[in-house]
């Protein structure tokens, strides 16, 4: 019987690999739990984290919460590794245009609630699930912490085009049912998010249609304060892939305002550049010959030809003689001019001497044949 018992114990099947691993891990956990009582009792060689704990941490799902946003938004451009860029459709400079973009000012001029197409391009495809976020912020530093929202008048107006957008949001997306309107929990800034869609066949950019639902001059809203629109390309977890910024003005006549601001911008740039060059020249090498410098400054105006209208032929002949004399003085060298002056002076002096010699010395009038004396 004893032999049979020994045989039975010998015939017990060994546990498979899965059961063996569970027993081994259970043994390790028991040992580790016995050592977690006091930290000073743990030997130095067991201070490291056990492998099963590391494996369990690695197998747990990571949280997909987006990183917290800062109070002051970043408005600088960041193309990123994907070379994220923005483009705008070319528009005519007429006053009747509803949306126009100025490359010199990096500014978009548009009317209230009108379609503003923005073209976005990347050099390579972003990760799946990427989104495009558009946020409006104030441009000046004293207003940057405030939330850009619609004025009370437009916010209370019942508009059928609002759709799912909250009434206080300035930025809207047109023609995209997947647009999501969000409010940041830290800064309360309003933003609208749409999924990134790859360009269609034959196109290199993705187009998003935006609407601005309040004028820049509305009291209680923007109140003539300039705003910026920040468009970011983000992953599904909220990590930044690229950022672009442009200024926006919502007005009644975008074409007129663009032309006015561009002309003012060019006028401001001209005196700055000319002033800089003049100061640099004066500081480096002051002119040794002021007369020569004056001539060089006026050389451009001296070469121009002007037309003067004169009434009356006598005046015309008189002014023509003056002009001819000035033209001759420009052609004749200064040394020859001095010779001609000496000749003219000698002629005038000779005439005066001849006239003085012909007259009587004592002041009596010389008689002519036809004239008679008073006594006669």
Curated annotation (Swiss-Prot):
Keyword Transcription regulation: yes
Region (Basic (repression of DNA-binding)) location: 347-372
Cofactor binding notes: Binds 1 zinc ion per subunit.
SUPFAM superfamilies hit by this protein: p53 tetramerization domain (SSF47719), p53-like transcription factors (SSF49417)
GO cellular component: cytoplasm; mitochondrion; nucleus
Residues under site feature: Interaction with DNA: 95
Known cofactor(s): Zn(2+)
Keywords for the protein's UniProt record, in alphabetical order: Activator, Apoptosis, Cell cycle, Cytoplasm, DNA-binding, Metal-binding, Nucleus, Phosphoprotein, Transcription, Transcription regulation, Tumor suppressor, Zinc
Organism superkingdom: Eukaryota
Region (Interaction with DNA): 249-256
Any one of the GO BP annotations: positive regulation of transcription by RNA polymerase II
Sequence segments annotated as region (Transcription activation (acidic)): 1-36
Family from the record: Belongs to the p53 family.
Protein's name in the database: Cellular tumor antigen p53
Natural source organism: Ictalurus punctatus
High-level lineage: Eukaryota, Metazoa, Chordata, Craniata, Vertebrata
Gene: tp53
């Amino acid at each position: 019987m004893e032999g049979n018992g020994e045989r039975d114990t010998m015939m017990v099947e060994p546990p498979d690999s899965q059961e063996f691993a569970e027993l081994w891990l259970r043994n390790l956990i028991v040992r580790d739990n016995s050592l977690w009582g006091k930290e000073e009792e743990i030997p130095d060689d067991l201070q490291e984290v056990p492998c099963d704990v590391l494996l369990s941490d690695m197998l747990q799902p990571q949280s997909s919460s987006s990183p917290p946003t800062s109070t002051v938004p970043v408005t600088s451009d960041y193309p990123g590794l994907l070379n994220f860029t923005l483009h705008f459709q070319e528009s005519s400079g007429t006053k009747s245009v509803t949306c126009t973009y100025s490359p010199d000012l990096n500014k978009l001029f548009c009317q209230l609630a009108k379609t503003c197409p923005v073209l976005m391009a990347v050099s390579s495809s972003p990760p799946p699930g990427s989104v495009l976020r558009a946020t409006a912020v104030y441009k000046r530093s004293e207003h940057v912490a405030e939330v850009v929202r619609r004025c009370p008048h437009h916010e209370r107006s019942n508009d059928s085009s609002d759709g799912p957008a909250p009434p206080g949001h300035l930025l809207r997306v047109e023609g995209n049912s997947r647009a999501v309107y969000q409010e940041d929990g830290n800064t309360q800034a309003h933003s609208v998010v749409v999924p990134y869609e790859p360009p269609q066949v034959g196109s290199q950019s993705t187009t998003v249609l935006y609407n601005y639902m309040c004028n820049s001059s509305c009291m209680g809203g923007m109140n003539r304060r300039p705003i910026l629109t920040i468009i970011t390309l983000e992953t599904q977890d909220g990590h930044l892939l690229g950022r672009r910024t442009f200024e926006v003005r919502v007005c009644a006549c975008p074409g007129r305002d663009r032309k006015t601001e561009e002309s003012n911008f060019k006028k401001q740039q001209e005196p700055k550049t000319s002033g800089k060059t003049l100061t640099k020249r004066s500081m480096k090498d002051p002119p040794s010959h002021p007369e020569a410098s004056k001539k060089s400054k006026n050389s451009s105006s001296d070469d121009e030809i002007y037309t003067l209208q004169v009434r009356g032929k006598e005046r015309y002949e008189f002014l023509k003689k003056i002009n001819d004399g000035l033209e001759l003085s420009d052609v004749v060298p200064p040394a020859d001019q001095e010779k001609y002056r000496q000749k003219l002076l000698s002629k005038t002096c000779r005439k005066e001497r001849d006239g003085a010699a012909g007259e009587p010395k004592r002041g009596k009038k010389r008689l002519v044949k036809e004239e008679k004396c008073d006594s006669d």
